[in-house]
Amino acid sequence: MMKLANADGQVSGSYFYEKYKQDIPLRGQLNGQGYVLSSSIYGNDDKDVDHLELTRAEDGIKGAFTSGSGKQLPVDLHVIPSGAVPEPKPGLHFSRGLDDYEKLQLANLTFAPGKTETVGGKYVIQWYTESRSKVSMFRVVSGYPAPVIASINNVIDSDFYENLSGYFGCSDETGKPGTDTLQVSDRYLDDRFVSYAVSNSWFCAGAAHPDFALGGTTIDAKTGKRLTQEDVYWLGIGSKPAPNSDAWMKYRDAVFGPAVVKLLKRLYPKEMMPVGDDNGCNYADPDVWKFGSWRLAEKGMYVGAYFARAEKACDNPEWSFIPYGELKKNNPALFGG
């Protein structure tokens, strides 16, 4: 499978083998009806890179492929009409729409069942590993009513597929996986919530530097629906804004960030002390708390901090939990207070 984008004769894109699913970056030129492409990131003189010479025809694109080792193969590509590719798995919901290339990349994945474990003495989960990436995720087996389990697992599967899309779409300069880690780093299940964190680190071809992130998901164990942070801990007045809307951005900037700093100063005065130089982690800055990750855990709601590139080591401190006592005062209907 291949996708190409043309900007004034400069072509960029990627392709993958169905056997591996991993993106291999492409770059080159379009001259008239002909493409001259290479899997090199920075220049055509790199060793062990693939080369393609392709020509557009009525029924697709044809040409020749030469591997880095010199092996030559014919190429015969057929255009897939936009929107013709079905979803990789029915019923999943992604934070952004997948294009046809990504849908094909996620199609026909296989998952090997792994160990089962009991969480909290009651809730049974089973782990599954995707065969190509070796990335693992759990699904809920028992502990909640069957219809709720189905909804919970739909949210988990949606996250899993979206993370796999990111994995296959990130390659290093040789076309091998650019993702170093992608794993569940924490999970919490009780009679009211299913919550987990996913840690990710990567260095994709063409990027200026490696990066890492922590993502969180929390699900209502009564309904099986995904919860936003505003569903759990709302500090505003009136109706809650839609996530990522202008009103939500304003709320996060003017209300949420400052309120979290005020609360954390009371809960963790030592950790929130202002730093005396430019090299410290300034957790007293409301901006670093506005858009961080969050999840529920034994200690309460974890709120992550997000710093600029030069201070990334300060991201997501271990201590920044809002206890359930505070959450109950804010949202007694949800937390049984």
How should these model regions be labeled?
Residues 1-58, 62-65:
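Central antiparallel beta-sheet cores of small beta-barrel/beta-sandwich binding domains
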Residues 82-195, 199-203, 291, 296-310, ...:
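Active-site acidic/histidine clusters and adjacent loop/turn architecture
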Residues 29-34, 55-57, 185-193, 218-227:
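A short, structured loop/turn motif at beta-sheet edges
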Residues 28-30, 212-227, 317-336:
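A short, surface-exposed beta-strand/turn
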Residues 18-34, 60-100, 211-218, 222:
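Edge beta-strand at a domain terminus
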Residues 216-279:
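Short helix-loop boundary/capping segments
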Residues 21-25, 47-50, 180-182, 210-215, ...:
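Short, surface-exposed coil-to-beta transition loops
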Residues 16, 205-210:
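Short consensus segments that form the blades of beta-propeller domains
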